[in-house]
């Protein structure tokens, strides 16, 4: 039903930390037994997805889109990002809200930024 029910992701700038920082295991609702009500416990199934982060340099006016052909002119550089997920909490909260609290507790980011200029020879 993902075509008909909007899914919201929730994140905070304050949850972005440098890779290597200790991550506190999140707590949330979990319902492992369908016969019992959900319980509020620490996550038991924690993982992360490796992603590519982009640093935007040149800005644009608020509310003004950037044409796809001009997008690269606005990118300063890239870095590796780990998007952490509390999968057991996510399984419970996913419908109808989407992965809200299960994905908002931590994002780790590489301390290194590779500029687009440095990547040019590898295009």
Language-model-detected regions and their locations in the chain:
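Active-site microenvironments in enzyme catalytic cores
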Residues: 1-123
